[in-house]
Curated annotation (Swiss-Prot):
Keywords carried by this UniProt record: Calcium, Dioxygenase, Disulfide bond, Endoplasmic reticulum, Glycoprotein, Iron, Membrane, Metal-binding, Oxidoreductase, Phosphoprotein, Repeat, Sarcoplasmic reticulum, Signal-anchor, TPR repeat, Transmembrane, Transmembrane helix
Keyword rRNA processing in annotation: no
Segments traversing the membrane: 63-83
CC terms in the record's Gene Ontology section: cortical endoplasmic reticulum; cytoplasm; membrane; plasma membrane; sarcoplasmic reticulum membrane
GO molecular function: metal ion binding; peptidyl-aspartic acid 3-dioxygenase activity
Protein name: Aspartyl/asparaginyl beta-hydroxylase
Native source species: Mus musculus
Residues binding 2-oxoglutarate: 608, 651, 671-673, 718
Organism lineage: Eukaryota, Metazoa, Chordata, Craniata, Vertebrata
Pfam families: Asp-B-Hydro_N, Asp_Arg_Hydrox, TPR_16, TPR_8
Length: 741
């Protein structure tokens, strides 16, 4: 029976039996010839199973001929593929690494066998534990096709390789195409928007420089502010302010711990950017005279490493709200996912259904708050402010919800510049939660923002009576004392407040005020605090302590006209110095009070007054009537008349005057002094560690963001003309966009 089957089947059974009797991994030659039981079977197998031999296949010569044809065809096909660049080998190479199953670094037949279960992984590729090895090996053997023709398996392997190759190449091309299509392309708008974490304000022009404008505490008793002769910023009560009016109140800049910004959405607000911050000087200045003893203040890192006090999760649900918790959670989930419009609708529906639900009302306020930021809408923000009030006024509102609602209401009122409204909200908070010192500290800030130092002082005294170690209260109380010119009394409060490391105390202005107070009482420890402020990143250097800066500007105390690039302005001033002098003397002779006393408490003693022609880039028309030729002379020099961070003014100083060491507010300007009436001896100015004197008809140029000090020990008055100019490295765009100081 077997020979007949061989004759009909062409030797297929012989091959199968041979494979079955031998090992599963026999060679292809063995598998193809098989082990026949009779010579007849071998002969029939040789002739393809047909008795006359004509249809049993090809002869040996024919087989060789066809083999050569196929081989040559393969060679020429390969040449064609390479020559015509049909396959991008750069794209194929390395793409099959993921299929390297045997660990030999490439993908080949052995890898395919492993993937198909015909071969074990190399030891380096085994990922299963030893105890599972035997079981896994057995499974692989079971999966192997028993009795299968090995030649057929090899063909299948080759087919698998080709399919995997095609799949890999096409997949990679698809992925690249998808990546290019799906990758967000940079848009022009990306360069026009403010990259603020809150994303609250209007888009700015390309290249706009953002400024760190921090809270301004306006005080009645002005302190040395490191802003020599500068008029300070306008009051934050924006509802009553007139942008066209010149600033008339001298304020003292001081930070709020929360860094609340007082600004309507409609107005562009300048935030700190990577281009602005503390200016870093590349120039080495001799600090050898500065004391560098250690100060026992916890570093910022140490403060951050201190484990925070675990806060209790606020309880925002009353008994009724707990019954609708699922609906509240669903609406809140929309808000947290950024689906603001949907969340607003959801909470509005909840408020409609459950008008007495404090949590629903509070959620509505939060959504309106978020929507105001998204749309940059003052109107929506005002709605949010009212809704926060409504949530706090509902009966049976949880105390935590009342506190959070009113606190946020106060913050958003401050944001809009509604300082009085914010103060009323803070007063109510303190009445409801009299033991919460944090709220009292915020109330003190509210009074300072309105310029009510006396009320703020009382608040901080109350806080310190209850919690004597409250660092936030100490630095603010010390600041108020210094503003009242109680220099010695302010020092321990400022010092201990900074040393506490409490939130809101690590601010450059507190370091400055402490150092300034120490300098005034002759305490050389002042420079230790300046050094620490520099190390903390608040000051560019021990000498350069301005707070409103643009990073990367050249920093050096003294400049030459050539270095500034404003040689024409300098030449014009020096050519016309007598004209400028004569008009200044005429204004003095009129004795109409046009020269105003310096009112920033920068003098230790003496008499120092100024007559201002330009301030913050705005011309004083009335003042220029007293010096018309001088004003006409300056009109063509926009680097000074357009300098919104400086002034143009006459400065007269009488004998016996000493101006404390102080620092200007910004590194964005340079200051020119033109000598008009200079006594032969006794007048000098120090900037950083170099002291110079004035000459009549000559211009001195220095960077007043560096510490400087003035002495007038002559026997007659000294008159100079002060001209501020933009720092020469500021771009035109920066000069347009930087806010005025």
């Amino acid at each position: 029976m077997a020979p007949r089957k061989n004759a009909k089947g062409g030797g297929g059974n012989s091959s199968s039996s041979g494979s079955g009797s031998g090992s599963g991994s026999g060679s292809p030659s063995t598998g193809s010839s098989g082990s026949s039981s009779s010579p007849g079977a071998r002969r029939e197998a040789k002739h393809g199973g047909h008795k006359n031999g004509r249809r049993g296949g090809i002869s040996g010569g024919s087989f060789f001929t066809w083999f050569m044809v196929i081989a040559l065809l393969g060679v020429w096909t390969s040449v064609a593929v390479v020559w015509f660049d049909l396959v991008d080998y750069e794209e194929v190479l390395g793409k099959l690494g993921v299929y390297d199953a045997d660990g030999d670094g490439d993908f080949d037949v052995d890898d395919a066998k492993v993937l198909l279960g015909l071969k074990e992984r190399s030891p380096s590729e085994r990922t299963f534990p030893p105890e599972e090895e035997a079981e896994t090996h057995a499974e692989l053997e079971e999966q192997a096709p028993e009795g299968a023709d090995i030649q057929n398996v090899e063909d299948e392997v080759k087919e698998q390789i080709q399919s995997l190759l095609q799949e890999s190449v096409h997949t990679d091309h698809d992925l690249e195409a998808d990546g290019l299509a799906g990758e967000p392309q940079p848009e022009v708008e990306d360069f026009l928007t403010v990259t603020d974490s809150d994303d609250r304000f209007e888009d700015l022009e390309p290249g706009t420089v953002h400024e760190e404008i921090e809270d301004t505490y306006h005080v009645e008793d002005t302190a040395s502010q490191n802003h020599p002769n500068d008029m300070e910023e306008m009051t934050n009560e924006q509802e009553n302010s007139d942008p066209s009016e010149a600033v008339t109140d001298a304020g003292v800049l001081l930070p709020h711990a929360e860094e609340v910004r007082h600004q309507d959405y409609d107005e562009p607000v300048y935030e700190p950017s990577e281009h602005e911050g503390v200016a870093i000087s590349d120039n080495t200045i001799d600090d050898s005279s500065i004391i560098s003893e250690e100060i026992n203040v916890a570093s910022v890192e140490e403060q951050q490493d201190t484990p925070p006090v675990k806060k209790k999760k606020p309880k925002l649900l009353n008994k009724f709200d707990k019954t609708i918790k699922a609906e509240l959670d669903a609406a809140e989930k929309l808000r947290k996912r950024g689906k603001i419009e949907e969340a607003v609708n959801a909470f509005e529906e909840l408020v409609r259904k459950y008008p007495q639900s404090p949590r629903a009302r509070y959620g509505k306020a939060q959504c309106e708050d978020d929507l105001a930021e998204k749309q940059r809408s003052n109107e929506v923000l005002r709605r949010a402010i009212e809704t926060y009030q409504e949530a706090a006024d509902l009966p049976d509102a949880p105390t935590d919800l009342v506190k959070l609602s009113l606190k946020r209401r106060s913050e958003r009122q401050q944001f809009l510049g509604h300082m009085r409204g914010s103060l009323l909200t803070l007063q109510r908070l303190v009445q409801l939660f009299p033991s919460d010192t944090t709220l009292k500290n915020d109330l003190g800030v509210g009074y300072l923002l309105l310029g009510d130092n006396d009320s703020a002082k009382k608040v901080y005294e109350e806080v310190l009576n209850v919690t004597p170690n409250d660092g936030f209260a100490k630095v603010h109380y010390g600041f108020i004392l210094k503003a009242q010119n109680k220099i010695s009394e302010s020092i321990p409060y400022l010092k201990e407040g900074i040393e506490s490391g409490d939130p809101g105390t690590d601010d450059g202005r507190f370091y400055f005020h402490l150092g300034d107070a120490m300098q005034r009482v002759g305490n050389k420890e002042a420079y230790k605090w300046y050094e620490l402020g520099h190390k903390r990143g608040h000051f560019a250097s021990v000498w350069q302590r301005s707070l409103y800066n643009v990073n990367g500007l050249k920093a050096q105390p003294w400049w030459t006209p050539r270095e500034t690039g404003y040689t024409e302005l300098v030449k014009s001033l020096e050519r016309n110095w007598k004209l400028i002098r004569d008009e200044g003397l005429m204004v003095m002779d009129k004795a109409k009070g046009l020269f105003l006393p310096e009112d920033e408490n920068l003098r230790e003693k003496g008499d120092w007054s100024q007559f201002t022609l330009w301030q913050q880039g705005r011309k004083n028309e009335n003042a220029c009537k007293g010096a018309p030729k001088t004003c006409a002379l300056l009109e063509k020099f926009s680097e000074t008349t357009g300098c919104r961070r400086g002034q143009i003014k006459y400065s007269i100083m009488h004998p016996g005057t000493h101006v404390w060491p102080h620092t200007g507010p910004t590194n964005c300007r340079l200051r020119m002094h033109l000598g008009l009436v200079i006594p032969k001896e006794g007048c000098k100015i120090r900037c950083a560690n170099e002291t110079r004197t004035w000459e009549e008809g000559k211009v001195l140029i220095f960077d007043d963001s560096f510490e400087h000090e003035v002495w007038q020990d002559a026997s007659s008055f000294r008159l100079i003309f002060i001209v501020d100019v933009w720092h020469p490295e500021l771009t035109p765009q920066q000069r347009r966009s930087l806010p005025a100081i």
